[in-house]
Amino acid sequence: MKHTLACLALAAVCALPAHNATGCTSMIVSAEASLDGRPILWKHRDTSASNNFLYRVDGKGRYGYVALFNGSDRLSLEEAWQGMNDAGFAIMNTVAYNLPANDEDFADREGYVMAKALQQCRTVDDFEALLQSLPKPMGVRTCFGVLDAEGNGAYFETDDYTWTRFDLEDAPGGVLIRTNYAYSGEPDAGLGYIRHRNVEDILAAQIESGSITPASLTEGLSRSFYHALKGYDEAECSERWAVDQDFIPRYSSTASIAIEGIGEGEEPSAMTMWANLGYPPCSHVVAVTLDSIPEEALPTSPRGAYSPLGLEASKLKEEVFPVKKGNGKRYIDLDAVRRISDEQYKISLEEYARRRR
């Protein structure tokens, strides 16, 4: 009863206008902080591209790779938005709104840089060398997160001309978190401060015990409507409606992907990408390897280069955001979330269990 009253008493806080900017949430987990002794690179993606697909690319560089691409009417593989390659290198990014703005005529090049990195990088140091070699301005304003087969990880907070490196080995608790502000950027500017706290609060016990798993991220974070300022999960309240504000899953969310690196003595072929495509509470993970992508995650839709998994999640998302008039898309039907997410969660757990037998 006390918890329900707290939900009602703080309802007014939810009435604040939601920000229109898209915002990703990400994390790099060291081998020491993970339950299975394998490092993890995770990104909860937010973007205006409503559908994603996975694809393997060969013949464009030194290494073949599997990556996330924007869905479209045609198959375009020029910009990768998260991926892993045959050398055991993985990469992702989150936009950092408190870094210097790009030159107007050359911006939004992050996907091109990540595709190039997957084609030619083996180590974290290789990626820094790539940044050094790229023509300036680079057209980026972002936190690049990278992981390699030796278990090294880092964020590179990067603008058109410079970057600041944060190594995983120096991170308290063996984890690094980034949302949409750079630690090296303008103080108190940017976005995602509450989402950053959401991650810290939800995973506090697992970080302390070194027991994080890929499911902690794709299921524990990407399905959570916890709000750090309120101190509880909205989906656990008895209320039906919530405003889409400062949760990890947002109206603009289109994927949650945890790339599980390799353990000691393993080859890069042992890497697994746990991929949830579409609005994460309305979808489920599929296990992806460097030589195997489930058909539902490929661009196999009759509509064009879209994934069936993402399209199905989009249909279910309509039930979560049923109000179409005015600011309707800002309102979450928590009854629908609870029902749909619980169903998809069970499918995810079955996939995790199947792959780990």
Segments the model singles out, each with a brief description of its role:
Residues 23-77, 82-83, 87, 93-119, ...:
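C-terminal, well-structured catalytic/ligand-binding subdomain of enzymes
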Residues 31, 121-122, 134-135:
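Sec/Tat-exported extracytoplasmic proteins
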Residues 126-145, 152:
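Secretory/export targeting leaders with adjacent low-complexity proregions
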Residues 1-4:
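Positively charged n-region of N-terminal signal peptides that target proteins for export
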Residues 123-132, 237-242:
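Charged, amphipathic alpha-helical segments
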